[in-house]
Amino acid sequence: MALKDLFERDVQELEREGILFTTLEKLVAWGRSNSLWPATFGLACCAIEMMASTDARNDLARFGSEVFRASPRQADVMIVAGRLSKKMAPVMRRVWEQMPDPKWVISMGACASSGGMFNNYAIVQNVDSVVPVDVYVPGCPPRPEALIYAVMQLQKKVRGQAYNERGERLPPVAAWKRTRG
């Protein structure tokens, strides 16, 4: 019997006894995915739905997003909720740069994702032209359940790591789930 087979048999026996085996990277990714702290960056009507996601009915805290952070230095996730004006874009970029690595961005609503329903010269047409976006949440405004689903999608992405082996960011995910009857 090969050494590898003996080791696998021993691991299986220890797992039956309740001992957990994992890599350090998986453990850190699990911890990060279950403690995502969002930065407050509500810009318009979507911010109201973002706040509603923390109420008793929706309870975003059960996914580890306990408290919205006012300081970017304490946040992991920036939720861009609403339209982004061209004057506000450099400020948002600066806030994103102040967030510690690893950091993620959720683009919430039609205005943040594509500029909104109207082509307005003062509005940035895509938030991903200012900061890299990891998850898009469609809707005008999206319901709190859609934001919670986006956080769940981001958790999956964080567990699988948001970067590949060369250090490049993985492509964004569209968080779409039917939230109404």
UniProtKB/Swiss-Prot annotation:
Cofactor: [4Fe-4S] cluster
Presence of keyword Plastid: no
Keyword 4Fe-4S: yes
SUPFAM superfamilies reported in the protein's UniProt record: HydA/Nqo6-like (SSF56770)
Residues that hold [4Fe-4S] cluster according to the record: C45, C46, C111, C140
Cofactor note: Binds 1 [4Fe-4S] cluster per subunit. This [4Fe-4S] cluster is referred to as N2.
Compartment(s) where it occurs, according to its Swiss-Prot or TrEMBL record: Cell membrane
GO cellular component, one term: respiratory chain complex I
EC number in record: 7.1.1.-
A GO term, aspect molecular function: iron ion binding
Swiss-Prot/TrEMBL catalytic activity: a quinone + NADH + 5 H(+)(in) = a quinol + NAD(+) + 4 H(+)(out)
PROSITE patterns: COMPLEX1_20K
Domain of life assignment: Bacteria
Chain segments annotated as coiled-coil in the UniProt record: none
Family statement drawn from the similarity comment of this UniProt entry: Belongs to the complex I 20 kDa subunit family.
NCBIfam families reported for this sequence: nuoB_fam, PRK06411.1
HAMAP family in alphabetical order: NDH1_NuoB (MF_01356)
Designated name of the protein: NADH-quinone oxidoreductase subunit 6
Source organism: Thermus thermophilus (strain ATCC 27634 / DSM 579 / HB8)
Lineage, highest ranks first: Bacteria, Thermotogati, Deinococcota, Deinococci, Thermales
